[in-house]
């Protein structure tokens, strides 16, 4: 289940946008071989709120585009499909029958700024950031160059399969 919570009032959150982002989340989960019913929360905020969350949770007093809060601890250099296709999850990761993957906090204000900066659509930028964040919920990271290359490659592959291009 995908929960969407709009906590900002600077941008209209259309049904078209929420459906597209739900489609992106579902597609990434399917492509990453997530078989369980799962729970992902997507929270829309403005720059001020994401800056506060970034400072509170990471000690970085700076606006960012998206924050990911995975609920599952993955072994180092492993992602969901590397580990959990053959193993079961501990019950603490479930809410009833749903696997709790985590939360995505997306600044729609920063998304708009970046879409202008990178010269593509707001929808494309939002889809990219949500794809990026879902991959974080599944254990991907970009702290080391090798991890970064793996994650960036996977992002582009997934967006390509969804036909979401820089021209979109």
Curated annotation (Swiss-Prot):
It is found in: Cytoplasm. The keyword Transferase does not apply. Zn(2+) binds at residues 132, 136, 142. GO terms for molecular function: metalloendopeptidase activity; RNA endonuclease activity; zinc ion binding. Its EC number is 3.1.-.-. Disulfide bonds: none annotated. InterPro entries: MetalPrtase_cat_dom_sf_prd (IPR023091), YbeY (IPR002036), YbeY_CS (IPR020549). GO terms for cellular component: cytoplasm. The keyword Zinc applies. Keywords: Cytoplasm, Endonuclease, Hydrolase, Metal-binding, Nuclease, Ribosome biogenesis, rRNA processing, Zinc. GO terms for biological process: rRNA processing. Its cofactor is Zn(2+). It is an enzyme of class 3 (hydrolase). It comes from the Bacteria. Binds 1 zinc ion. It holds the Pfam family YbeY. Single strand-specific metallo-endoribonuclease involved in late-stage 70S ribosome quality control and in maturation of the 3' terminus of the 16S rRNA. Belongs to the endoribonuclease YbeY family. This is Endoribonuclease YbeY. The gene is ybeY.
